[in-house]
Amino acid sequence: MTNITQNQKITVVGAGLAGSECALQLADMGYSVVLYEMRDKTMTPAHKTHKFAELVCSNSFGSLGEHSAPGQLKWEAKKLNSHILQAAFEAQVPAGQALGMDREVFSAIMTEKVKNHPNIEIRNDVVKSLNDIPRPAVIATGPLTHDDLAESMRQHFGDEFLYFFDAIAPIIDADSINTEIAWKADRYDKGTGDYYNCPMNKEEYNRFIEEIQKARKIEPKDFETTDFFEGCMPIEVMVDRGPQTLRFGPMKPIGLDDPRTGRYPWAVVQLRQDNKEGTAYNMVGFQTRMAYGEQVRVFRMIPGLENAEFLKLGSIHRNLFINSPKRLNKDLSSKNDPWLFFAGQITGVEGYFESTCTGLMVSRFLNQKLKDQPFNPPPRESAFGSLLEAITDPTRAEHFQPTNINFALLPPLAEKERDKTLRKEKQIAIARNVMEQWNP
């Protein structure tokens, strides 16, 4: 396949975040892309629309902070002209220091981008076997891969998939929020006051925890164990770890002074704007597997949400992922088939934007391979390079678990820096310097 030209068709399976990004990047390079998306014919347990790059869990890409690891990942993606990032800013809604989006506007933008690109052919069909698609190919089918294709992949790799469960938080009608109790503010008054905050005193919190414990839960079917990713942990699982866990997690009150009392309450439930019109808010960090009726009953105990109208209730679904350090090469191609690439959450990254970045990287790696260029990965010191290392380092294979971007993935400084803030600033400076020099 060394004589492949720019006219060679590339198959991308899955029009989620990673697949859409990868397809657009390859198409921009002049390649003809055939993009498969099954949701016109077969829906997943979590998706609600047929649009591309649908956001099924949170509506946030995480921090934009200049000295945060997620912020650095976005800085690098912007330098590489990420289509997903551009669309996110076009669909941006107020979310403090995070990049929040109107999920419908965002998906509509991405769908139009993909459908209108002259080098992309869309096929609304279900791919059931790796043998059905020509190479080169990119599999970006996500954690909710069709069962038949998942079985084909299992046979290809010769071992079982790994899996974990994650959960989706409810969305509330803004008009049903009691603004005499809930107030708008960002933590420590940073930002423009984009979050509604629902306060609880100690007695209210304790009763709330008791009702979460009593509530009927939806248990996953057909599995003996239930592993949850830490970043999408259901609140009832957190409560099982101890009654105060929520107070030090999604309900931490520090930096949120209740205007009625002048000090921060015992606990706080935060609501983040979910659409551009500001008519819908999601419950931050409130992923849940409680039964629907129980969610309504328990969440209406929250001060400010006594009469809450739920536009969407929380749910749970299973996520599949490959043991990438064991089964994938550094360029995210299969060790069993060098022209079969993988991108997105199925590679073991966790998070919308991390998934996007793997799609962006695969587009560069595939381009290098098609042009017979040496493999040129992003520098190890960069956020992109650190994320890639986390999912391809063979030493991680035995205990591999999904990861999102964080400072622990970046290499330590050559000279130890005791000050945590300065240490992070120096790591960011190094990452930016090496990315400025990288020419993929």
From Swiss-Prot:
<protein>
    <recommendedName>
        <fullName>Methylenetetrahydrofolate--tRNA-(uracil-5-)-methyltransferase TrmFO</fullName>
        <ecNumber>2.1.1.74</ecNumber>
    </recommendedName>
</protein>
<keyword id="KW-0521">NADP</keyword>
<keyword id="KW-0808">Transferase</keyword>
<dbReference type="GO" id="GO:0030488">
    <property type="term" value="P:tRNA methylation"/>
</dbReference>
<keyword id="KW-0819">tRNA processing</keyword>
<dbReference type="InterPro" id="IPR036188">
    <property type="entry name" value="FAD/NAD-bd_sf"/>
</dbReference>
<dbReference type="GO" id="GO:0005829">
    <property type="term" value="C:cytosol"/>
</dbReference>
<dbReference type="GO" id="GO:0047151">
    <property type="term" value="F:tRNA (uracil(54)-C5)-methyltransferase activity, 5,10-methylenetetrahydrofolate-dependent"/>
</dbReference>
<dbReference type="InterPro" id="IPR004417">
    <property type="entry name" value="TrmFO"/>
</dbReference>
<comment type="function">
    <text>Catalyzes the folate-dependent formation of 5-methyl-uridine at position 54 (M-5-U54) in all tRNAs.</text>
</comment>
<keyword id="KW-0285">Flavoprotein</keyword>
<dbReference type="Pfam" id="PF01134">
    <property type="entry name" value="GIDA"/>
</dbReference>
<dbReference type="GO" id="GO:0050660">
    <property type="term" value="F:flavin adenine dinucleotide binding"/>
</dbReference>
<dbReference type="GO" id="GO:0002098">
    <property type="term" value="P:tRNA wobble uridine modification"/>
</dbReference>
<feature type="binding site">
    <location>
        <begin position="14"/>
        <end position="19"/>
    </location>
    <ligand>
        <name>FAD</name>
    </ligand>
</feature>
<dbReference type="InterPro" id="IPR002218">
    <property type="entry name" value="MnmG-rel"/>
</dbReference>
<dbReference type="InterPro" id="IPR040131">
    <property type="entry name" value="MnmG_N"/>
</dbReference>
<keyword id="KW-0520">NAD</keyword>
<comment type="similarity">
    <text>Belongs to the MnmG family. TrmFO subfamily.</text>
</comment>
<keyword id="KW-0489">Methyltransferase</keyword>
<keyword id="KW-0963">Cytoplasm</keyword>
<keyword id="KW-0274">FAD</keyword>
